[in-house]
């Protein structure tokens, strides 16, 4: 029996980045031998065990053979005779196919992963790459993480990703897994690389058609020097990641705020009148298909519907501001307002030449929200009021508070 550290922990060590979970591969062992040493079996589809003290995952070396459609259509062989090199060969990218003997510090790198780390290239391990459609999503997600380090996708790997997209295999991806990869990309340093990689691989359309529909749609150059709505979408996603690092609620709402522009009739280009209302339908469709959590959908709908109103909040009547807050459920969910402000700021700054622009509207929104929130029904004299009259009096008092906070 021989144990090696594999995968992301080895890769991140070589990149001099903090490592996440430690994954281990065990060569030359059987499940019975693992359990005899105190390991607990947890793998459903292949033999994975938890270490009795650390709780880290130890998987028996295995090979995988394609047996059906999708990323679950594989036959697994975890015979004790499977070698380390055979186990590494089934992995997706060379940078993830490096093992380390922790006793000696020796690296086992049969597929050139160290070279590709040095050259900042994301490259597939072998021709079996095309057997798993999930790898297209993983490539895009890794690019969202590693593009800031200078990584690019190898041309031959991109060609295989396009082959997968053309095969129809992407249709076999389950919604939960698509959302899982998208969510990870949104909290990466450069979500735009996720979008751009899928777009270049012709995979964004099959997976996220609402987002693909924005590429090639022009906007008015005086407001959007980047012109292409798809590029604006990328810039807004990166700005959201910068303004709210690690917040996938902000990331998702910022990503989907302009979906309505993909539905603008071409004869109306480059104007997109009513795109904020038009965007709700494709947003709902995307959320239903990927089973997006309700909290994410509610914030995204609020940002999609109201971002133009927030941009011009100084022009809105005080009563209109209160109505805006009500539509966002901001008086019942006050934590939502700061995120809406961040999404709108990402929209305003996610434009060519506007990356460092101020966005005072965000502070105005938060200030007026606090003013409205400071007035509660218990603060009013409602002795002679009943039913709807109490609500009307509360609304009037809140409008007055908003006016005073201007």
Curated annotation (Swiss-Prot):
<feature type="binding site">
    <location>
        <position position="138"/>
    </location>
    <ligand>
        <name>ATP</name>
    </ligand>
</feature>
<keyword id="KW-0819">tRNA processing</keyword>
<dbReference type="InterPro" id="IPR003607">
    <property type="entry name" value="HD/PDEase_dom"/>
</dbReference>
<feature type="binding site">
    <location>
        <position position="23"/>
    </location>
    <ligand>
        <name>Mg(2+)</name>
    </ligand>
</feature>
<dbReference type="Pfam" id="PF01743">
    <property type="entry name" value="PolyA_pol"/>
</dbReference>
<feature type="binding site">
    <location>
        <position position="8"/>
    </location>
    <ligand>
        <name>ATP</name>
    </ligand>
</feature>
<keyword id="KW-0808">Transferase</keyword>
<dbReference type="Pfam" id="PF12627">
    <property type="entry name" value="PolyA_pol_RNAbd"/>
</dbReference>
<dbReference type="GO" id="GO:0016791">
    <property type="term" value="F:phosphatase activity"/>
</dbReference>
<dbReference type="InterPro" id="IPR006674">
    <property type="entry name" value="HD_domain"/>
</dbReference>
<comment type="function">
    <text>Catalyzes the addition and repair of the essential 3'-terminal CCA sequence in tRNAs without using a nucleic acid template. Adds these three nucleotides in the order of C, C, and A to the tRNA nucleotide-73, using CTP and ATP as substrates and producing inorganic pyrophosphate. tRNA 3'-terminal CCA addition is required both for tRNA processing and repair. Also involved in tRNA surveillance by mediating tandem CCA addition to generate a CCACCA at the 3' terminus of unstable tRNAs. While stable tRNAs receive only 3'-terminal CCA, unstable tRNAs are marked with CCACCA and rapidly degraded.</text>
</comment>
<dbReference type="InterPro" id="IPR012006">
    <property type="entry name" value="CCA_bact"/>
</dbReference>
<comment type="subunit">
    <text>Monomer. Can also form homodimers and oligomers.</text>
</comment>
<feature type="binding site">
    <location>
        <position position="91"/>
    </location>
    <ligand>
        <name>CTP</name>
    </ligand>
</feature>
<feature type="binding site">
    <location>
        <position position="141"/>
    </location>
    <ligand>
        <name>ATP</name>
    </ligand>
</feature>
<keyword id="KW-0511">Multifunctional enzyme</keyword>
<keyword id="KW-0547">Nucleotide-binding</keyword>
<dbReference type="GO" id="GO:0005524">
    <property type="term" value="F:ATP binding"/>
</dbReference>
<feature type="binding site">
    <location>
        <position position="11"/>
    </location>
    <ligand>
        <name>CTP</name>
    </ligand>
</feature>
<protein>
    <recommendedName>
        <fullName>Multifunctional CCA protein</fullName>
        <ecNumber>2.7.7.72</ecNumber>
        <ecNumber>3.1.3.-</ecNumber>
        <ecNumber>3.1.4.-</ecNumber>
    </recommendedName>
</protein>
<keyword id="KW-0460">Magnesium</keyword>
<dbReference type="InterPro" id="IPR043519">
    <property type="entry name" value="NT_sf"/>
</dbReference>
<dbReference type="InterPro" id="IPR002646">
    <property type="entry name" value="PolA_pol_head_dom"/>
</dbReference>
<keyword id="KW-0378">Hydrolase</keyword>
<keyword id="KW-0694">RNA-binding</keyword>
<keyword id="KW-0479">Metal-binding</keyword>
<keyword id="KW-0548">Nucleotidyltransferase</keyword>
<keyword id="KW-0692">RNA repair</keyword>
<dbReference type="InterPro" id="IPR050124">
    <property type="entry name" value="tRNA_CCA-adding_enzyme"/>
</dbReference>
<keyword id="KW-0533">Nickel</keyword>
<feature type="binding site">
    <location>
        <position position="21"/>
    </location>
    <ligand>
        <name>Mg(2+)</name>
    </ligand>
</feature>
<dbReference type="InterPro" id="IPR032828">
    <property type="entry name" value="PolyA_RNA-bd"/>
</dbReference>
<keyword id="KW-0067">ATP-binding</keyword>
<dbReference type="GO" id="GO:0042245">
    <property type="term" value="P:RNA repair"/>
</dbReference>
<dbReference type="Pfam" id="PF01966">
    <property type="entry name" value="HD"/>
</dbReference>
<comment type="similarity">
    <text>Belongs to the tRNA nucleotidyltransferase/poly(A) polymerase family. Bacterial CCA-adding enzyme type 1 subfamily.</text>
</comment>
<dbReference type="GO" id="GO:0004810">
    <property type="term" value="F:CCA tRNA nucleotidyltransferase activity"/>
</dbReference>
<feature type="binding site">
    <location>
        <position position="141"/>
    </location>
    <ligand>
        <name>CTP</name>
    </ligand>
</feature>
<feature type="binding site">
    <location>
        <position position="8"/>
    </location>
    <ligand>
        <name>CTP</name>
    </ligand>
</feature>
<dbReference type="GO" id="GO:0000287">
    <property type="term" value="F:magnesium ion binding"/>
</dbReference>
<dbReference type="GO" id="GO:0000049">
    <property type="term" value="F:tRNA binding"/>
</dbReference>
<feature type="binding site">
    <location>
        <position position="138"/>
    </location>
    <ligand>
        <name>CTP</name>
    </ligand>
</feature>
């Amino acid at each position: 029996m021989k144990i090696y550290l594999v995968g992301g922990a080895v890769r991140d060590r070589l990149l001099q980045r903090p490592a996440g979970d430690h994954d281990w591969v065990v060569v030359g062992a059987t499940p019975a031998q693992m359990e005899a040493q105190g390991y607990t079996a947890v793998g459903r589809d292949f033999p994975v065990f938890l270490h009795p003290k650390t709780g880290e995952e130890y998987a028996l070396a295995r090979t995988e053979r394609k047996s059906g459609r999708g990323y679950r259509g594989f036959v697994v062989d975890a015979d004790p005779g499977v070698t380390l090199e055979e186990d590494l060969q089934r992995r997706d990218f060379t940078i993830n196919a490096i093992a380390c003997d922790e006793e000696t510090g020796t690296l086992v790198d049969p597929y050139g992963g160290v070279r590709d780390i040095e050259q900042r290239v994301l490259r597939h391990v072998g021709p079996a790459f095309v057997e798993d459609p999930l790898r297209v999503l993983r490539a895009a997600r890794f690019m969202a993480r590693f593009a800031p380090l200078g990584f690019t996708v190898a041309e031959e790997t991109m060609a295989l990703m396009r082959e997968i997209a053309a095969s129809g295999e992407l249709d076999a991806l389950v919604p939960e897994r698509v959302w899982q990869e998208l969510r990870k990309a949104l909290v990466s340093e450069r979500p735009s690389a996720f979008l751009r990689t899928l777009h270049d691989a012709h995979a964004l359309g099959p997976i996220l058609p609402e987002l693909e529909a924005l590429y090639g749609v022009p906007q008015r150059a005086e407001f959007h020097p980047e012109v292409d709505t798809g590029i604006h979408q990328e810039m807004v996603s990166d700005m959201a990641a910068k303004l709210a690092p690690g917040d996938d609620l902000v990331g998702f709402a910022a990503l989907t705020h302009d979906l309505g522009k993909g539905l603008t009739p071409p004869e109306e280009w480059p104007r997109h009148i009513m795109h904020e209302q038009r965007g709700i339908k494709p947003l709902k469709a995307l959320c239903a298909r990927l089973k997006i959590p309700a909290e994410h959908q509610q914030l995204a709908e609020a940002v999609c519907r109201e971002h133009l109103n927030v941009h011009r909040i100084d022009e809105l009547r005080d009563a209109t501001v209160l109505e805006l807050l009500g539509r966002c459920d901001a008086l019942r969910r006050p934590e939502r307002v700061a995120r809406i402000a961040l999404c709108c700021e990402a929209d305003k700054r996610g434009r060519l030449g506007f990356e460092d622009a101020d966005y005072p509207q965000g502070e105005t929104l938060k200030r007026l929200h606090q003013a409205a929130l400071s007035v509660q029904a218990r603060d009013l004299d409602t002795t002679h009021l009943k039913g709807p009259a109490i609500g009307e009096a509360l609304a009037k008092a809140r409008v007055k508070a908003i006016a005073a906070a201007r």
